Structure formats: C-alpha cells, structure tokens
Amino acid sequence: MTNPFELTATDAIKLIGNNKLSRYEWVQSCFERIREKEDLVKAWVYLDEDRALEKAKQLDNKGDKSQLGIPFGIKDIIDASNTPTGFGTNFYQNNVPMRDAASVAVAKQSGCIFIGKT
C-alpha cells in the first residue's frame, strides 16, 4: 500500500470504510512525514500531535464510518480552541482563543482531525 500520507482524502476514506486503514494510522503517517520534512520546509508554527492522535483513536474505536477523520491544518490567523493563534507576530504570542472559528468548528463537527497551524 502507498504511504497513508500520500493518499487523497477520497482514497483514504474508502480504505477506512473497508477496514484497510485506520484513522490513527493515517494521522500518524501525516505527522511522520511532517517530522521528516519540517526542517527543510519550515511550514508549521504549531502541531497538536497528541490531541490529533487521541481524536483519531476515538473515531476508530467508535467504528462510525460517517466521521471522516480527515487530518487538516489551518493558517495561524484562524482560531482553534485552546490553541495558540499568533497571527505571525510576537505581539499575539500568548493569544489562546477559547472558541473555534466557524470553519474549524464545522470541520471538527464533520469528524475532521485538527493537526496544527501553518
């Protein structure tokens, strides 16, 4: 099988639906790839690996195929609850919103898994 991080969301969801891939494996593969390339790319300002993997595990244990489990990241100008939002400046370095932006809330309600900020 292809490395899970290389799969399209459509292909990964099909494999999850056929019990050939877990959400945990998919998210874990994404983090492995990020760790492998981040020194070169320098794209991520915040990663939430522990919470993301825990969420993936919860979705896998539920067995609910309607919860997609798609890993997603957002720009550091968009709020995600209990996650630093720095707007790319030191002035806001201690800004930790308590609520998700509407787009993040909708993604999470659909079972998508927040992995971090770029």
Give the ranges of each region predicted by the language model.
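Glycine-rich loop at the start of a catalytic domain that most often binds anionic cofactors/ligands
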Residues: 56-61, 85
